[in-house]
């Protein structure tokens, strides 16, 4: 199955799940809690308030070497958006500069490490992890950082 098949399948619309494709073209569905969406909105708003020259967006489908992954929140520059639009592809053939995952208790550290690696391989400059305590962890391709290089004013905690 290809991402275009998923997007165009009417039976997969309006499901209470985040849908991704693994490297074998199989659908992977993850349940979404309302608080997850609230956190995504807070992060999106905070990014848009602090970073000019682009836009924060939720639920961003990114083509990776292990299938399609959907980042919870991303920030992409206008230049990156032009590159994504010019490719005319669904999903995005290159990752936005910042990819954020909102972790839940069902996410393992190994799963998050894999997603970070996939986003970096696809072109992300930073990957952020938001944990259930409200703490943010910032990563660049070299490892974990004390704060974001791209948005140094971003808080280390975002409470709901």
Tell me what each language-model feature is:
Residues 1-160:
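Gly/Pro/Ser/Thr-rich low-complexity, intrinsically disordered segments predominantly at protein N-termini
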């Amino acid at each position: 199955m290809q991402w275009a098949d998923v997007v165009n399948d009417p039976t997969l619309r309006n499901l209470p799940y985040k849908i991704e494709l693994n490297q074998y073209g199989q659908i992977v569905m993850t349940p979404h809690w309302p608080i997850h969406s609230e956190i995504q909105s807070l992060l999106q708003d905070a990014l848009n308030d602090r970073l000019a020259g682009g836009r924060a967006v939720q639920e961003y489908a990114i083509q990776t070497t292990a299938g399609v992954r959907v980042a919870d929140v991303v920030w992409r520059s206008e230049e990156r958006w032009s590159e994504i639009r010019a490719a005319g592809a669904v999903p995005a053939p290159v990752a936005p500069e910042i990819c954020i995952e909102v972790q839940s208790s069902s996410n393992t550290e190994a799963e998050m490490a894999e997603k970070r690696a996939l986003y970096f391989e696809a072109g992300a400059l930073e990957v952020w992890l938001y944990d259930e305590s409200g703490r943010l962890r910032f990563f660049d391709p070299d490892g974990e950082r004390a704060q974001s290089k791209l948005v140094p004013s971003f808080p280390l905690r975002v409470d709901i």
